[in-house]
């Protein structure tokens, strides 16, 4: 049930910090979230890709071609891991600088979110209470029907479904009514939050810390990131050349062997 309320809260207050805001957890840094996601994604691709390569090499065609793809895949995975390790400090520095530049704005927005949260919490609590009551009423109405079904035969299945349908529809209608009431209650606070954000951004423009300045600083950081990443990417290119050349030689050898067999026939 708590998940229902939290979901509605997230829909009401969108943003990357919404989950931590409502659960009162210490928010994970933006860079940590990006880094964790990228690590999981890359590892999943690497593992699944290796499985496919292993399956192909174990097949009759793979054995006949003898391309040694698995060896090349492991070499490639090792090279990519080294690149990721080398780029880690560079991207960390970029993200740290960007977070410092926007720290003031984020602090002000966090204060606004906390204030709005205190105002809307009673409405969320009331919604949760009413939802509990509706579910309990539905359970009490359905319980006798379940007992009746257990005591009856299969022919009563349709009869049971006919009795359950209006009860389920009633629960859905009442739930929609409660959600609509909650939406109307929260609407003014949602508008208030949007107005606060607009005011914060307007204050940035008038105070000299304009959005254009933030954009310029972010562009500078991205440019610096690109310059620092160039040598690492060049190392990656050099590391891939032997792998690609080995793969090319294996494929050409397989084609040549196949041609000889065809000519011999």
Curated annotation (Swiss-Prot):
Post-translational modification: Glycosylated.
A biological process term (GO) from this entry: positive regulation of phospholipid efflux
Protein name: Apolipoprotein A-I
SUPFAM superfamilies with a match to the protein in the record: Apolipoprotein A-I (SSF58113)
TM spans (from-to): none
Native source species: Bos taurus
Name of a matching Pfam family: Apolipoprotein
GO cellular component: chylomicron; extracellular vesicle; high-density lipoprotein particle; low-density lipoprotein particle; very-low-density lipoprotein particle
Positions of the UniProt region annotated as 10 X approximate tandem repeats: 67-265
Known function: Participates in the reverse transport of cholesterol from tissues to the liver for excretion by promoting cholesterol efflux from tissues and by acting as a cofactor for the lecithin cholesterol acyltransferase (LCAT). As part of the SPAP complex, activates spermatozoa motility.
